[in-house]
Amino acid sequence: RDDVESRGLGDVYKRQILFLVGSYAYKTNGAMVLGTAEAGAKITLYNLDNLNPKTVNAKTAYFKTIHHEFGHILNQTKPYPTDFAEISGPDYVQDQCFEIYKTTESALQKGFISPYASKADGEDFVELIALYVNRSAEEWEEMLTTAGDTGRPKIEAKFEIVSNYMKSTWNIDLNELREIVLRRAEEAPNLDFDSLDDEDTDTPENSGTNE
């Protein structure tokens, strides 16, 4: 593992369960579920039957979902500062997020990094982590530029809390993590998954990692 993964995360990794499901999951309202995080220990990822390792990259839902859900695991283990929720407090819209914000641009201009981030402060927090580490510095700046004079200050204020939390609580520098994630995403299509050694991948210490 890269050094950034092991800093302060030993206990989290030891108890983490990664559960992979081939099909999609759906909520009672018909919304598709890409992943879930439970009790600070279990991540479930769905629709793996449709994952093509030759085309997966940092912009696909899989990379973002993994970091989104692991962000929840971290928050469930050690909560983030309560002042984060105050920045966009009255603007969270729960399950109406995709109805109210039909485009990423409209969400950005309201101060949310994605439409889904407007659901609740917990989703907002982990969406900032997931999108930051899966986008280049140039792409992130483009999003902030789109957010404009109203949305940008809110996103930047929230991200400062996110970044400080990750560094002070878990000793993870998000800039360093982003470099690793983008590198791995670029390498993913060239990996030979058929030749993975079962002896290496089935051991408890490797279970649930993203190598």
Regions inferred by a protein language model and the residue ranges of each:
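Single conserved hydrophobic/aromatic residue that forms the stacking wall/gate
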Residues: 2-13
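A generic structural signal for short, solvent-exposed coil/turn residues
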Residues: 10-11, 35-37
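Intrinsically disordered low-complexity regions specifically enriched for long asparagine
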Residues: 11, 15-16, 30
